[in-house]
Amino acid sequence: YLKLRTSYGLTGNDEIGGDRFMYDQEYIYTSDYFLGTTSKNHTIRGLMQGRLANPDISWEKERKFNIGFETNLLGKLDISFDYFYNRRFDILCIPSRNIPSYIGADMPYMNLGKTKNQGFEASIRWSDNIGKKIQYFAQLDGWMAKNKILYNSESIQTEDYFYRTG
């Protein structure tokens, strides 16, 4: 037999860590801003602006493509091969651009990152019998994958080998 297969799809990743409300402005109740004390000598703390909001934020996305086949020859030799190509985009990053400290807030998360991942998996298996009571098989598996960060919003580095992009 010979079986051919292929698939294509768009998936999303909502596993974004602890900052669930990146679309909303946050304010932090902190002792960094001292407003004074009460008559009973209790400290009055203030609010500090946190990371800037991004109302256009969305989940990370990935386009996935896979093509492959499997076959059996002579009832004893199984061969399978798969090629895959995945492209992730809109990966959440904090932009490397600096904003003046007098703004008093950090840059927001943005959907800027891009990666690609491609490779293959292959398998060859021979199975047979010796008489009626002994069965054996030999199998060889192999794979190769190549991952590349296409964009990661990194700061300017002094040497090229410091960059994770590329």
Model feature map: region roles:
Residues Y1-G166:
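Extracellular/periplasmic, surface-exposed regions of secreted and cell-surface proteins
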